[in-house]
A protein has these predicted regions:
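Charge-rich amphipathic alpha-helical interaction elements
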Residues: 22-23, 44-47, 92, 176, ...
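Flexible, processing/modification-adjacent segments and terminal tails
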Residues: 95-149
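Post-signal-peptide N-terminal segment of Sec-exported extracytoplasmic proteins
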Residues: 38-79
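Amphipathic hydrophobic-ligand
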Residues: 52-56, 83, 181-183
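An acidic-aromatic
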Residues: 66-117
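Bacterial Sec signal peptide processing site at the extreme N-terminus
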Residues: 15-38
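Gly/Pro-enriched, hydrophobic low-complexity segments
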Residues: 129-192
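Sec-dependent bacterial lipoprotein signal peptides
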Residues: 1-23
């Protein structure tokens, strides 16, 4: 019962955090940044899965050859540290348990109960479609900005950023797959 109450409290805190994103910081560069270029992103993440929820921070350092993500819990503690490179992926959870795999999504589900579509997330945070996505699976608004796509079982929804120099980049992502819902609020994204 106590865990159920904590899960609901965490979900409420996450929704309040997501609602307070009106003051997003401007992006470091205009829309010329591509998914193959290095960047650093900071934001907030909320995941709902089964009868549980996670909310906290996300910090991500991306290069074409590697990714490093830190997921922080609501009180600032590290919930997971994820490293991906040519040899595969390593996830270290809050209990210092390490999982190594060539399939990060499966490792995240095994460890945390939810996952991120890391293989294509660099495209999504930039408001771009991965090359493998068919045009029929992509929806754009009147300004030709990406608002939704379907890929690898994930349904991705994009909320456009309102800063003048944001280009096609979204302010928020909502990602759904099976019984998992993940929301990311992008507070800052800079080229490195």
């Amino acid at each position: 019962m106590k865990g159920h109450v904590l899960a609901h409290a965490a979900a409420l805190v996450a929704l309040l955090l997501l609602a307070g994103c009106a003051g997003l910081q401007p992006f470091g560069r205009e829309e010329t940044l591509g998914a193959t270029e290095p960047f650093e992103m900071q934001g907030r993440v909320y995941a709902r899965f089964s009868d549980r929820a996670f909310s906290g921070s996300i910090r991500w350092r991306h290069t074409p050859a590697a990714d490093e993500l830190w997921l922080g819990g609501p009180l600032g503690q590290t919930a997971a540290h994820i490293v991906r490179d040519a040899s595969g992926a390593t996830l270290t959870d809050a209990h210092q348990q390490t999982y190594r795999s060539t399939n990060l999504e499966a490792s995240m589900r095994d460890s945390m109960g939810w996952a991120l579509p890391l293989a294509d997330l660099s495209h999504y945070v930039l408001g771009q479609t991965p090359s493998a996505v068919a045009d029929a699976n992509v929806k754009r608004n009147a300004d030709k900005r990406l608002i939704a796509l379907s890929h690898d079982g994930w349904e991705i929804e994009f909320t456009p950023a309102e800063q003048p120099n944001a280009g096609s980049r979204p302010a928020r992502l909502r990602m759904l797959k099976d019984a998992i819902e993940v929301r990311i609020v992008i507070d800052q994204l800079d080229a490195t």
